[in-house]
């Protein structure tokens, strides 16, 4: 099944999960999986939150990310992936002062 993110409406999520600025998402959700292409402009972030009933996979398409994962910090660049398993917590921050962070995320729903 093809999903064309260019055909999906981009929606602003202000202070998503308690983060800074707007998180922009183009989302496909079939009730079983949430599949998203996201954008964080400079100065924007997704706040620290836990995944108690699901997990999340984030693949960096372009830009630089700082990911807070439990007690650690991880730097991510294009081609790298972050995995937050069920029962863990994370945050995603655009680490660039000049370029947007583009990413692809999958959240399997239980």
Q: Where are these predicted regions, by residue range?
A:
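Histidine-centered metal-chelating micro-motifs
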Residues: 45-47, 66, 82, 87-92
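Glycine- and acidic-residue-biased ligand/ion/polar-headgroup-sensing regions
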Residues: 53-55, 59-65
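Conserved short histidine dyad/triad with adjacent acidic residue
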Residues: 36-51
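Ligand-binding loop in jelly-roll beta-barrel domains
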Residues: 86-110
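A generic "binding-loop/recognition-motif" signal
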Residues: 42, 53, 72, 88-89, ...
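A short, N-terminal "cap"/entry segment at the start of jelly-roll beta-barrel domains
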Residues: 1-32, 47
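Short acidic-glycine-tyrosine-enriched beta hairpin
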Residues: 72-86
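Well-ordered beta-strand scaffold positions
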Residues: 33, 64, 72-74
């Amino acid at each position: 099944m093809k999903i064309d993110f260019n055909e999906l409406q981009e929606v602003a999520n202000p202070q998503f999960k308690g983060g800074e600025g707007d998180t922009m998402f183009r989302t496909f959700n079939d009730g079983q999986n949430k599949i998203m292409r996201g954008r964080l402009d400079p100065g924007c972030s997704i706040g620290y939150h836990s995944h108690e009933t699901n997990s999340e996979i984030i693949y960096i398409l372009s830009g630089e990310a700082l990911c807070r994962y439990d007690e650690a910090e991880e730097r991510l660049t294009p081609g790298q992936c972050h995995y937050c398993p069920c029962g863990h917590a994370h945050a995603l921050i655009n680490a660039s002062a000049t370029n947007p962070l583009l990413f692809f995320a999958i959240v399997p729903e239980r």
